């Protein structure tokens, strides 16, 4: 039986696709999972046993550069012996600097490397190892910064969604709650803007339109502060910290205001939840903007840059959307058409074929 190691770490945007890939492969191949300490907090170790290889970000802090460099070399040694001990046949990397030691060692040990790029901009580590990879799993042929000479390495699939999502109940495209239920997702990083600005938007909206809020908040203290504000003026609310199983909240959501991580926005499209994307402006290579722009160009969402966000303008837009629902329902129908071919079995068969044919 072929052995696959899936390497991940860092933010939820790297980890969630990794555990989905693990679920796709575990029945047909001997499958292993590695992460760094940051990524480990997003993983249920009981369901997804993983080995921790902690990789420091060498370029982040010049003061502790020598120490980080030493840790980096330690992670290379650890990666080398792990790959050799497990006799891995394929390394599947979800990108990020935490993948560097394993990819380097896989190259040395002549282990086949498969990369995964869910974003519309080629990540830096993926770009570095593209030359040495067998294939790169993507959702589109039109990825920015992708070298033309390696276009033949792209392996296209429909967007990766967790298996539980396919079994979840999806509402009709013509349904809407009274009052409307809005989901606010700040992501696993850069959520402070959502805690402050979007909560002010919610309070302003409530002055003109009754609504119900489900909101991801960055920490417990802010949950208490926001909950108090919402309760004082009578806004029905459900506030929570980052949640790997956020899909359990999707079933009766009418609208979302969200960051533009690839996993999150593809899940919203699959559930036919119209959304306003506000990309995280500090995301590497501005990839969140291009993730959202790709869907915006297909008439699947609305898009505004964080530096262009004005509470009064966004409030006016949302109120008009609630009054004239034609555009709202049009988005839902477009989402339904876009997602109808995305099935677990279709993606699963393609991913298995990828391993068997390489």
Regions found by a protein language model. Name each.
Residues 14-25, 38:
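Short amphipathic alpha-helix
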Residues 61-90, 108:
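An amphipathic, basic-hydrophobic alpha-helix
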Residues 340-358:
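C-terminal alpha-helical cap of glycosyltransferases
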Residues 88-90, 251-266, 273-274:
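Acidic donor-binding loop of glycosyltransferase active sites
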Residues 23, 34, 40-48, 166-170, ...:
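Donor-nucleotide binding loops and adjacent catalytic segments primarily
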Residues 6-9, 27-71, 186, 305-307:
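Conserved nucleotide-sugar phosphate-binding/catalytic loop shared by glycosyltransferases and other
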Residues 3, 30, 38, 109-170:
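Active-site-proximal region of nucleotide-activated glycan assembly enzymes
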Residues 302, 307-339, 357-358:
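Conserved donor-nucleotide binding/catalytic region of nucleotide-linked donor-dependent transferases
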């Amino acid at each position: 039986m072929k052995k696959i190691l899936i390497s991940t770490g860092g933010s939820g945007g790297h980890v969630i696709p990794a555990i989905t890939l693990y679920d796709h492969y575990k029945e047909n191949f001997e499958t292993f999972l590695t992460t760094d300490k940051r990524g480990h907090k997003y993983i249920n170790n009981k369901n997804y046993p993983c080995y921790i290889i902690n990789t420091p970000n060498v370029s982040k802090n010049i003061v502790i550069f020598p120490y980080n460099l030493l840790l980096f070399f330690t992670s290379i040694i650890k990666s080398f012996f792990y790959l050799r001990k497990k006799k891995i046949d394929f390394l599947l990397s979800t990108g990020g600097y935490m993948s560097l030691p394993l990819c380097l060692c896989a190259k040395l040990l002549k282990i086949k490397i498969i990369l995964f790029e869910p974003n519309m901009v080629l990540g830096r580590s993926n770009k570095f190892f593209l030359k040495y990879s067998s294939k790169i799993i993507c959702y589109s042929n039109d990825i920015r910064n992708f070298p033309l000479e390696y276009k033949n390495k792209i392996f296209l699939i429909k967007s990766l969604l967790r298996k539980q999502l396919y079994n979840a109940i999806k509402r009709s495209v013509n349904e809407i709650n009274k009052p409307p239920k809005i989901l606010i997702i700040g992501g696993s990083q850069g959520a402070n803007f959502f805690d402050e600005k979007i909560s002010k938007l919610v309070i302003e909206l409530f002055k003109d339109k009754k609504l119900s809020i489900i909101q991801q908040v960055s920490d417990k203290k802010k949950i208490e502060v926001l909950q108090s504000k919402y309760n004082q003026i009578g806004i029905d609310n459900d506030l929570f910290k980052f949640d790997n199983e956020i899909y359990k909240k999707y079933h009766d959501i009418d609208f979302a205001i969200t960051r533009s991580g690839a996993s999150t926005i593809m899940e919203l499209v699959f559930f036919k939840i119209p959304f306003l994307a506000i990309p995280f402006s500090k995301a590497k290579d501005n990839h969140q903007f291009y993730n959202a722009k790709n869907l915006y160009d297909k008439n699947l969402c609305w898009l505004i840059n964080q530096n262009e966000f004005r509470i009064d303008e966004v409030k006016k837009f949302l109120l008009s959307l609630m009054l004239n629902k034609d555009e709202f329902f049009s988005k839902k129908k477009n989402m339904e058409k876009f997602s109808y071919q995305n099935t677990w079995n279709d993606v699963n068969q393609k991913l298995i074929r990828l391993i068997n044919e390489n």
